[in-house]
Amino acid sequence: MTYRMIVSLALVIISMNYLEAQDFREKPENVYLNVSFVVVQPQAEFSRNVTNNGYGVDFDGGWYVYNGPVGLGLNLIAAQYGNFSRKIPYSYFSSLVSLTETTQSTIFIVNPYIKPTLRFGDFSFHAKFFAGYQLLETNTTIKNDEQENNQQEEDEPDYIAKSKVSSDSAFDYGVGLGMRFPIFRNLEKGPIFLSLEMKWSKGGEAEYLNASKEGAIVLSDPAEGPVTTTLNPDRSKTDLFNISLGIGF
């Protein structure tokens, strides 16, 4: 998991703490929100091309219809499953100044769902039935040392150049099981919950690049002239198993 993903997750937790500090007495009791760390594990033929797990952030929110046992909601996931970096000289004539070229493969998932729930006071156990959309992207960025180490000023760009080198999508559907229980109680603002969830999904066929896979990105020999890059994407169905652990309201 990259430094940027760790920072993103930290910002999410800080944001949740800020929201918790606000007055939530006006929030409807039948509305819920979870922000979680997610591990995305490829399954079946997808796992033969992507042997490593993906790591990212899982946003989940919805409402219980008429405060009953059935919830309707939306789940958003962003997880990185591939990464490849190399140092390149800034100038063809000197290697004293170098840049970092990074290629990252990311999956984005959007899933509306129905959520039957069994509640015992603040404790709840639920199932999920969902269907939605997966987007698999690979992007390459070039950064200097300050940008790579996040030392640039706020008004300065995060990178020198960026290109999308691979993109495809697929529909998915699946089921999930999970639970929520309070870990902190505030009489005025309500409890803070710990959320644990597992999801199994069947994905359609898509073409994708795994930047971490050997042979997916092939570079020519610099001694033979300007470097050329050959991409070798894979194509398969995109089945997944996800585990999410986070906090919610």
Q: Residue locations for each model-derived region?
A:
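A generic hydrophobic-segment detector
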Residues: L33, D145-G204
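Gram-negative (and chloroplast) outer-membrane scaffold detector with strong preference
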Residues: G62-Q152, E156, D168-Y173, N186
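Cleavable N-terminal export/targeting peptides
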Residues: M1-E29, G248
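Extracellular loop and loop/strand-boundary signature of outer-membrane beta-barrel proteins
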Residues: Q43-N49, S94-T103, P157-S166, T228-P233
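Residues that define the transmembrane beta-barrel architecture of outer-membrane proteins
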Residues: E29-V31, T51-V57, Q104-V110, F123, ...
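Short glycine/proline- and aromatic-enriched beta-strand/turn motifs that initiate or cap beta-hairpins
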Residues: A21-G71, N242, G246-F249
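Predominantly the C-terminal beta-signal and adjacent terminal strand-loop region
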Residues: G178-F249
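Residues on the lipid-exposed face of transmembrane beta-strands in outer-membrane beta-barrel proteins
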Residues: V35-V39, V57-W63, A78, V110-L118, ...
